[in-house]
């Protein structure tokens, strides 16, 4: 019942921010002033709640629910619609609405609606969309060339808050989320025991550092693959947006803060590696325990020892990091060390005739971190790509030539919507100077063939989705926000590679609209980032499933708790298979809803299993960060 009350409140009332402070965020977007101050905000007039760059398309979506939990909340818009300046209410544009798809109900949301195009408004400032007949308005938004830069900083700071064994102290952490270093006590990460030989003190290892994987505080080598590669790829694509001022302890050291953050993770991965080049699989606990805050958890920590999946995973991550770190003179020694470690891991992996696929028994909670042999071999191609980039050794080029069609782009449409590091590595390889020209041509032709095949993955198609951000219904699974962001990243690859210059605007628009979906242009009218009120959101995710920000604590709810969760965490997203994943069928929403409404803003644990909907992950985060970074310049 509590969950139903929360979602009703979310849809009917304007949310008041509870968390955050001036130290954590920039000044919020100005609210309507003067005679406009009393105009109510409604979740039926949807815009990107942060805003738009001046020359980008700008289209508000006006929603009218037809099916689902909110079907009784009908909305009949007036005409004309206006864009008003927030500071004084001046009307800067007045125009008509366009019915979406001739008034049809969009099946995946259960809504019909209208579009209001205000792309002609380009002057920087704060605005809102106004329905005069209903005396209702959208969220206030900014038009500014750098409107997404502060959002990028907030999203990247999630990794700082996820650091294990590191103090979260002011001025780098807001007062609400100050915490002592976690897992530095006796028999914890600095003295982790082998879970397969728990009493053998000779196998105690220092495995401190790294990032908490998700809403739990465990650390997985194989789960780090996507975020490490994707963050490095994001930096390579748009280095100028990743500046040295993201308010982490390393800020101002002359190295971009994204690189500092990735190095925090690779430093831990180095501790996971054995002298023979192999790597341990994961670190965590053998009991389920809350950690609110993480420093309060004093349980002993254990590791799963050497496994071929972890070994080939670190080979790729070390090689990629070596390539990127090598461009910084201050990190030349680190780059050389990572190169040697990547080579050692590669050799160890290649020496194993029968790859290990059952290393993780589940004794260390919670997620199973094994890879099957097919996935290990695919990640070996990724490792070979980056090893070739840093060595020019033909051994690695030969391996890529022989095995590149084992990568995800050849198993699925959409190239990089899943296992994004594989598709992105292949495109990176095609751009290296000493690659076989025939293979380069073949890879780019295969990418273009994927684009030409369509499958509703590439390019903006107006009739596909009322909310302008189509993904297939099959992608509304646990973690749907991950492929959603990667649909955008795959479209932007087409632009970067200039594969279809005549149609370039369609790919950019598709990616932009997917970003706007994250920022509130969706059936919930909610920003899919936690507690973003200090950054100007009118309605953002208030609760996420995370052991630190757990149900009933001072960090539980951005509306009603003392603090709420830290800003900028990307939750898993709508999940039409929620009941299969443990959510009770009686809890509706998220159960029994159209795909886009298969979401509930809550964080209750067992037996409601909110982790299948609202748990964040370092891999969801990296997909969103990469997408956002392309527009933060």
Predicted regions and their residues:
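Aromatic (Trp/Tyr) and acidic
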Residues: 45-135, 160-225, 229, 267, ...
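An active-site-proximal structural segment forming one wall of the substrate-binding cleft
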Residues: 258-276, 303-356, 396, 400-403
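Bacterial N-terminal signal peptides that target proteins for export
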Residues: 1-7
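Bacterial Sec-dependent N-terminal signal peptides
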Residues: 17-38
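Acidic, glycine-anchored loop motifs typical of Ca2+
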Residues: 250, 254, 258
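Solenoid-like repeat scaffolds
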Residues: 405-413
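Bacterial N-terminal signal peptides
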Residues: 7-17
């Amino acid at each position: 019942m509590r969950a139903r009350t929360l979602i009703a409140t979310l849809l009917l009332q304007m949310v008041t921010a509870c968390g955050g402070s001036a130290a954590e965020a920039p000044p919020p977007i100005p609210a309507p002033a003067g005679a406009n101050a009393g105009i109510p905000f409604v979740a039926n007039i949807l815009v990107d709640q942060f805003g738009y760059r001046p020359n980008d398309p700008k289209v508000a979506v006006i929603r009218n629910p037809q099916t689902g939990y909110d079907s009784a909340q009908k909305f009949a818009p007036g005409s004309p619609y206006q864009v008003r300046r927030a500071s004084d209410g001046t009307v800067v544009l007045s125009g008509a609405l366009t019915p979406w798809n001739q008034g049809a109900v969009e099946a995946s949301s259960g809504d019909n609606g209208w579009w209001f195009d205000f792309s002609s408004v380009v002057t920087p400032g704060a605005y809102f969309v106004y329905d005069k007949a209903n005396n209702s308005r959208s969220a206030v938004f900014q038009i500014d060339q750098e409107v997404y830069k502060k959002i990028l900083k907030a999203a990247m700071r999630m990794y700082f808050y996820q650091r294990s064994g590191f103090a979260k102290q002011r001025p780098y952490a807001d007062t609400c989320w100050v915490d002592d270093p976690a897992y530095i006590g006796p028999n914890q990460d600095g003295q982790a025991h082998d879970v397969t030989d728990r009493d053998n003190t000779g196998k105690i290892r220092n495995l401190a550092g790294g990032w908490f994987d998700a809403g739990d505080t465990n650390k997985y080598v194989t789960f780090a693959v996507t975020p490490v590669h994707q963050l490095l790829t994001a930096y390579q694509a748009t280095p100028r947006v990743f500046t040295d001022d993201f308010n982490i302890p390393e800020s101002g050291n002359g190295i971009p803060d994204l690189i500092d953050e990735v190095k925090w993770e690779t430093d831990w991965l180095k501790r996971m590696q054995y002298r023979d080049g192999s790597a341990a699989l994961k670190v965590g606990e053998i009991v389920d325990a809350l950690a609110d805050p993480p420093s309060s958890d004093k349980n002993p920590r254990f590791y799963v020892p050497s496994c071929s999946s972890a070994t080939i995973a670190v080979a790729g991550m070390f090689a990629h990091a070596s390539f990127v770190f090598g461009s910084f003179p201050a990190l030349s020694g680190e780059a050389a060390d990572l190169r040697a470690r990547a080579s050692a891991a590669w050799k160890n992996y290649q020496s194993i005739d029968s790859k290990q696929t059952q290393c993780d028994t589940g004794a260390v909670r919670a997620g199973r971190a094994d890879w099957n042999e097919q996935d290990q071999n695919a990640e070996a191609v990724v490792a070979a790509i980056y090893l070739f980039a840093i060595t020019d050794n033909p051994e690695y080029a030969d391996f890529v030539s022989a095995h590149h069609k084992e990568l995800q782009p050849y198993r699925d449409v959409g190239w990089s919507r899943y296992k994004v590091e594989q598709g992105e590595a292949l495109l990176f390889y095609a751009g290296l100077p000493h690659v076989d020209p025939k293979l380069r041509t073949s890879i780019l032709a295969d990418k273009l063939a994927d684009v030409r095949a369509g499958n509703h993955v590439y390019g903006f198609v107006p009739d596909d989705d009322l909310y302008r951000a189509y993904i297939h219904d099959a992608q509304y699974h646990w973690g749907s926000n991950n492929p959603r962001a990667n649909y955008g990243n795959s479209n932007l690859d087409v632009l970067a590679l200039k594969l279809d210059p005549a149609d370039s605007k369609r790919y950019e628009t598709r990616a932009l609209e997917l970003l706007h979906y994250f920022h509130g242009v969706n059936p919930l009218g909610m920003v899919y980032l936690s507690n973003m009120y200090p950054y100007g959101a009118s309605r953002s995710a208030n609760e996420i499933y995370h052991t630190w920000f757990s149900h009933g604590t001072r960090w539980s709810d951005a509306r009603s708790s003392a603090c709420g969760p830290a800003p900028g965490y990307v939750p898993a997203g709508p999940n039409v298979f929620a009941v299969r994943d443990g959510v009770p069928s009686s809890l509706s929403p998220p159960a029994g809803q159209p795909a886009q409404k298969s979401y509930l803003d809550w964080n209750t644990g067992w037996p409601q299993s909110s982790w299948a909907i609202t748990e964040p992950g370092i891999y969801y985060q990296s997909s969103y960060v990469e997408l956002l970074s392309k527009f933060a310049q």
